[in-house]
Amino acid sequence: SYRKLSRGMKSIVSNIIGICSNASITIFDEPTIGLDADNRNEFYKILLDSYIKNPRTIILSTHLINEVENLIENVVIIHKGKVIVDDSIDNISQKSFYISGDKSDLEKLKCLKNTTPDKSFGSKQVYKYYGDINEDDLKFIESLNINLETMNLQDMFVHLTKRGNKNE
């Protein structure tokens, strides 16, 4: 009986029902709980194949953000009952950065005024930043030895929920 199944097997049964329903809106709430890495990968592969054959809205809630980052088109982040991000993955990747360089250079960036460094190594600092970067800051970044790298979705999520979305 269903009640005697392990948590992972219950997840598989629920996922099969969700995928096979082909409903116009399909909701998966933590669909990989109890699944090992191989079964999680298999679920994502089957989900993507199903979506390609039958495009529809799939809502997926997960704490394993790094596993779904390449599968999603839109992201909604809810923190303390409020939506703090609702945007396409493309737009989010254009606003999520690691900014690193010499402390004296980074202090001149307007976009970092109300933030604190994520890491410091002597005179070097690394910031996590989510938001738009103005033209003056971009020109300044290009003229100095400041590194600008795209932040992954998981780090962006942690940054925004940990810091209360202060710098947006």
For the regions a language model picked out, list residue spans one by one.
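Short, surface-exposed beta-strand/loop "edge" segments at domain boundaries and coil↔beta transitions
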Residues: 26-27, 31, 105-109, 133-138
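ABC transporter nucleotide-binding domains
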Residues: 1-66, 70-73, 79
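Generic structural signal for individual residues within well-ordered alpha-helical segments
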Residues: 41, 93, 154-157
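ABC transporter nucleotide-binding domain
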Residues: 44-131
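C-terminal coupling/interaction segments
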Residues: 121-168
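Residues that scaffold the ATP/ADP-binding catalytic core of kinase and kinase-like folds
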Residues: 18, 108-109, 156, 160
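Functionally constrained cores in energy, signaling, and assembly domains
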Residues: 2, 13-18, 26-27, 50, ...
